[in-house]
Amino acid sequence: MATNLQIPPALKKRAEQIKVLLMDVDGTMTDGGVSLLSQTEEIALEIKTFDAHDGQGLTLAHTAGLRTGCITGRQSSALLRRAHEMYMEFIYMKQPLKMPAYEEIVQKTGVPESAVAYIGDDLPDIPVMRRAGLAVAVGNAVPEVKKTAHYTTKALAGHGAIRETIELILKSKGIWEAMIDKARA
């Protein structure tokens, strides 16, 4: 987490406009590992690990009035549960191409693309990142994603990158201190 984040003016200008925060899941909300627990030869239980600091950040984002969501290529009941716990409004799973989901969210919210932030880590995220007003790469994203991003987190995927992005947005808006007072468990 970047608690003493110094925000360059151009980045601040982008971040202060954000009203919708979208993100990838595997390699962004999680560290990218996919753990499978075999139950039978045909059935496996998928286990995902989510970061508590990222969760607190998502709760603060919701409290601040940001609309949040995720777009992922995989189907996951663990993700669905976590997304609901974090008050995510938009949950798009089984999306091999992310642009149709992104465009639908932009249409549903009625916000300009300059008011949308997207956090990603890998090649399927690049088309959305090219359109989002604030494109964020997690610290361990592939080089092509980092090159596309307006900001790369110091934190790694699944270890505070979402929280760092939310802090960037809320600090740019000048409401971070007020959100600290509203933090809840």
Write out the residue ranges for each language-model feature.
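Active-site neighborhood of HAD-like aspartate-dependent phosphohydrolases
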Residues: 2-64
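Fold-independent oxyanion-binding glycine-rich loops
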Residues: 24-26, 32, 74, 121, ...
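Short secondary-structure boundary segments
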Residues: 25, 73-74, 95, 139-142
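Substrate-recognition element of Asp-dependent hydrolases with the DxDx(T/V) motif
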Residues: 34, 57-82, 92-93, 129
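Short, conserved SAM-binding/catalytic segment
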Residues: 85-86
